[in-house]
Amino acid sequence: MSNHVIVIEETFNAPVEKVWEALTDKDKMKQWYFNLDDFKAEKGFQFSFPGQGHKGEQYIHLCEVTIAEPLQKLQYSWQYKDYEGYSTVTFELFDEGDQTRLKLTHEGLDSFPQHPDFAVDSFRGGWTHLMTISLKDYLNKVS
């Protein structure tokens, strides 16, 4: 597997329906993910949100849902306004009864400019925090 691909798997003590809601309901997403103005798990839906780099730089994330299979798979493009590069983020859900295994894959990272904020380690750190701390804490609260 390319070192420009991030794969993180985490098992949550929550049914697949709760995990899907956390990934697709904008009000729930705001509690663990990013502050999105709107989000719909529908192919073709476009959304954007601000983010901050290591030194305070502001970035606008530009995304479009490319796959939305309820309770199974969500994928969207991930780009930055005014920067080259195109990547995809995929969330795959595996129903394990009272638990859900979630596999996150972020591909295409080598298409971004050579910059510390776009480094694979930066993305890996961000996704690891979101999956193993933010989302896990959120689901533990609501399940």
Each predicted region: which residue ranges?
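A conserved amphipathic terminal alpha-helix motif
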Residues: G108-S143
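Short coil-to-beta transition motif at edge beta-strands of beta-rich domains
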Residues: E42-F49
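Residues at helix-coil transition
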Residues: T24-D25, P70, T132, N140
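A short gly/proline-enriched turn/hairpin at secondary-structure junctions
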Residues: I6, K30-D37, F49-K55, S77-Q79
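Hydrophobic ligand-binding cavity/cleft-lining segments
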Residues: M1-D38
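Tryptophan-centric aromatic hotspots in well-structured domains and transmembrane helices
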Residues: W20-L23, W32, W78, F91, ...
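Hydrophobic pocket/interface hotspot
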Residues: V19, M29, F47, V65, ...
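Hydrophobic-ligand binding "helix-grip"
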Residues: D38, K55-Q99, E107-D110
